[in-house]
């Protein structure tokens, strides 16, 4: 590459800051004693006269340091331990001041752009397209697999994770912040774990498990949307490829096989151990993080960057639970998209006629709640029968990415059809973390559920290339068609008889087209599952 001009160091620094988007729990610049004790995370963008001279890019008008706004509206009674969890009123227990960016600027120091924008001034609109993994060319498939593996092995250039709760965050001596580096992909796993972990109530006490900041409530779709957007942007930056996009897995096939579980894609089943991935796949070498639940729950520690055992996966292999041995039907998606109301009281896993609860998979595809049902998103996770079916571990299996991009595609189609009607996304009394204006845990800078409740092509810089299945006829419609067909047949017979009576001349026989196609509506007998109200994925 030829270079004819030498750019000033400040411009080079600005370019690098624009290139690396900040989405971490906390930026590395704020993981220090001074920032934690002050409760201020407003890093400089281009400090020209020493530290603290350009917080949030204020000198160039990109942003300013302001007080954090956290939702204070009441949550539901499912969580009775107010004051015990660092995730409450996120992120006020850690920081009370952060950057507020102007215009299309974004990031922890306003050094980058909002989703859908790029360029030094963040004034160039960009749209990436998420496509079906199976529709990609061989080169595109290989590139995606290599990119995932690179993300697994690349230390995040900007972000660190906390390995202790707030009361122990400064270490035993009070001067050693407990943060660690982590890879780009393992950070994706860690954020999911942190959102679903139990609330530690103290040494010798059982941790409280009926809490989940990203499942079983209205924030399920908005939280996972941002989670994916974070990974996509991180990988774009890692690859230096702004057009890179995450593909999806259309799991609504009705089949008992995983069509993306091949060695050139997500890995086939090992011939040596049916619960492992084939050694011919790069993913057989991956090791999981965040698996030491007993340690976290009894000692009050957090998941760190230590990797453990391999990914386990045995699609359709749970012979003891036939209901999870087959993937959702295409028609399940069609029916789900006909549920017009986003969410309904009690805004939990037992909500009925709720689009959110239906696509999450706690209701039947028609929207009717049934405690024995696991459908759509939940069924796809359970079908994988391994790491991908355990809530705290599921993102360790990279199929998680593909499964959730398709779930997000369904969400985006619903938003398009119903004009992003947020009126039934509750402002209060949802499970903790799920109120409309709650800052989603543990993302940084703070971002609310509302900000993700928008159509993606117009607001978030990406779109889906997907063909939705058509609507089958319902039983009542089939009966109506049959009645109409019978009446037409009677009318035709009567007409022919009348003609024969009126005229004895020989006439050519005419064929009357009839509606004789057989339409079968999808139905499946779901087995009752243990703990039906507990989040499985």
Swiss-Prot record:
Disulphide bonds annotated for this chain are 30-41, 42-65, 56-99, 101-110, 113-122, 258-261, 290-303
> Which ranges sit in the Lumenal, melanosome compartment?
25-477
Known EC number: 1.14.18.-
Q: Which residues cross the membrane?
A: 478-501
Per its UniProt record, the required cofactor names are:
Cu(2+); Zn(2+)
Describe how it is modified after translation: Glycosylated.
Quaternary data? Monomer. Interacts with ATP7A. Interacts with SLC45A2.
Name this polypeptide is given: 5,6-dihydroxyindole-2-carboxylic acid oxidase
Q: What is the lineage of its organism?
A: Eukaryota, Metazoa, Chordata, Craniata, Vertebrata
């Amino acid at each position: 590459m030829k270079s004819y001009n030498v750019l000033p160091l400040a411009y080079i620094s600005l370019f690098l800051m624009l290139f690396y988007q900040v989405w971490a729990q906390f930026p590395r610049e704020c993981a220090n004693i001074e920032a934690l004790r002050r409760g201020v995370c407003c890093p400089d963008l281009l400090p020209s006269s020493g530290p603290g001279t350009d917080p949030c890019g204020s000198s160039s008008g990109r942003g300013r340091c302001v007080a954090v706004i956290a939702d204070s509206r009441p949550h539901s009674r499912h969580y009775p331990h107010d004051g015990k969890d660092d995730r409450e009123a996120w992120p006020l227990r850690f920081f009370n001041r952060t950057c507020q960016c102007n215009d299309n600027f974004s990031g922890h120091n306003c050094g980058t752009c909002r989703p859908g924008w790029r360029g030094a001034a963040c004034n160039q609109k960009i749209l990436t397209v998420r496509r079906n993994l199976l529709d990609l060319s061989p080169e595109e498939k290989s590139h995606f697999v290599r990119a995932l593996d690179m993300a697994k092995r690349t230390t995040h250039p900007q972000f660190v994770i906390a390995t202790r709760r707030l009361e122990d965050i400064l270490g035993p001596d009070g001067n050693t912040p407990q943060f660690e580096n982590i890879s780009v992909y393992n950070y994706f796993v860690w954020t999911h774990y942190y959102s679903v972990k139990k609330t530690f109530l103290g040494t010798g006490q059982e941790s409280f498990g009926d809490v989940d900041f990203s499942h079983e409530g209205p924030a399920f779709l908005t939280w996972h949307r941002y989670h994916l957007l974070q990974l996509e942007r991180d990988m774009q930056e890692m690859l230096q490829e702004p057009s890179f996009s995450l593909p999806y897995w259309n799991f609504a096939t009705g089949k008992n096989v995983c069509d993306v579980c091949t060695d050139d894609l997500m890995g086939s089943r090992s011939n040596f151990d049916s619960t492992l991935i084939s050694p011919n796949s790069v993913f057989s070498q991956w090791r999981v993080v965040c698996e030491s639940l007993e340690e976290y729950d009894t000692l009050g520690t957090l998941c760190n960057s230590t990797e453990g055992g391999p990914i386990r996966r045995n699609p359709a292999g749970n012979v003891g639970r036939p209901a999870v041995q087959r993937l959702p039907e295409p028609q399940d998606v069609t029916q789900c998209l006909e549920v017009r109301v986003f969410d309904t009281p009690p805004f939990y896993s037992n909500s009925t006629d709720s689009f959110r609860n239906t696509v999450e998979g706690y209701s039947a595809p028609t929207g009717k709640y049934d405690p024995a049902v696991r459908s759509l998103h939940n069924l796809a996770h359970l079908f994988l029968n391994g790491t991908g079916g355990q809530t705290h571990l599921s993102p360790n299996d990279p199929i998680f990415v593909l499964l959730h991009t398709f779930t997000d595609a369904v969400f985006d189609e619903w938003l398009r059809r119903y004009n992003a009607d947020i009126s039934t996304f509750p402002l209060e009394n949802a499970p903790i973390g799920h109120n409309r204006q709650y800052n989603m845990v543990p993302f940084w800078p703070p971002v609310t559920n509302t900000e993700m409740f928008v159509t993606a092509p117009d607001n978030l810089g990406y779109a889906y290339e997907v063909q939705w299945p058509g609507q089958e006829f319902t039983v009542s419609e089939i009966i109506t068609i049959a009645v109409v067909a019978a009446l037409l047949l009677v009318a035709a017979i009567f007409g022919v008889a009348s003609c024969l009576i009126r005229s004895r001349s020989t006439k050519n026989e005419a064929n009357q087209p009839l509606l004789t196609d057989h339409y079968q509506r999808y139905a499946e007998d779901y087995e009752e599952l243990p703990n039906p109200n507990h989040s499985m994925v």
